[in-house]
């Protein structure tokens, strides 16, 4: 006969009696409620810190875009993210970090090549000034950026095309979420394919792989786009 499943210490100690299935059910409900409260608290803290960070940098007059899982969820698939990514110009990175420090964030100059970090109420803000592949916040990306609403806060985020290129380039095995974020945007956004091709040149081989895979899963990617990008990588 198989041994019965172990029970928690709390269940075993209820008035010295043998635990019943109802005890375990009650504990499960309690645990679920606790997790839900924690999730609600985390979401509230995230929204509050996001607002504080965005409004502080806006008041200081620096140009930036919200990047990462939050940005992609506003044009693609809903996805919870635990941190905030701000894409800034390299020359502004230290100043933006100082703005957040003045606003009550703890800060660190994490890596002088591409990222600084700020923290408040267990929420991390990544101040990114160079994306893998040598992508920077430039005038063209800013001019193509769009506004979306998040919890009553207007956020400026990269265009769907720029997000696809960025996600396709930064994708690695341990960060597969970027790949699936890009696929969701490909499947849901009305894209300017010529602009996407133009921006994809910085990482054409990776973006080509993404588009071929997307087309193989019946996401509508025009064959001429794949053909043009193939020529960019391998020649005519």
At which residue positions do the language-model features occur?
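Compositionally biased terminal segments of proteins
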Residues: 2-236
